[in-house]
Amino acid sequence: LTPEQKKVYEQMKKAAIAVLNGKVTTTMTVLTQLMRLHQITCGYVAADDGTTQQVESNRLNELMSVLEDTDGKVIIWANYQMSVSEIMQALTKKYGANSFVHYYGLTPQEDRQDYIRKFQNDPECRFIIGTPQTGGYGITLTQANTVIYYSNGYDLEKRLQSEDRAHRIGQKKTVTYIDLIAEDTIDEKIVEALRKKINIASEV
């Protein structure tokens, strides 16, 4: 985390504890507080009115550094639409607009199959960026040999389904999975639970 992120994260953590100590908690209340902390690790602060404010973050730089050391085609999963937009801007700047396609909530329905075909068949298209909520189900992305989780949600099924996009019939390569994690934050807890096949939503 950057110094600014650490400051905001600790403030939000104290606020979350106060909220959880001050009322009868529901699963949704707990998950909301967890995801607010998680958003800070990704560079955003979410307000009660639904607006978001950016906080200086190293995560995008870390992603670009990982991509420099990665060969072949790559699936990049992000939990938030704002992250997808940021990643697309960074890829356009470094690799060009033809280097990627996207598959998330703002991707037009009529373009989605064309984008999958482009990723699978066009050598110039190295990256597909999406959210597990939208792109994690039912599509085949077997040309990828690397899957990067820019950020994770707490839903185990979405994680497992998104992992399987590169492991469909026709995959002949070994697939490498990479999680970007902010140390000493909720990030570590989320990824640890997902790797242990624990559905956080059902454990709260």
Annotate the PLM regions.
Residues 154-204:
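A conserved SF2-helicase RecA2
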Residues 84-88, 112-113, 126-174:
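SF2 helicase motor core recognition
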Residues 41-44, 145, 181:
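Short, histidine-centered active-site or binding-site loop motifs used for metal coordination
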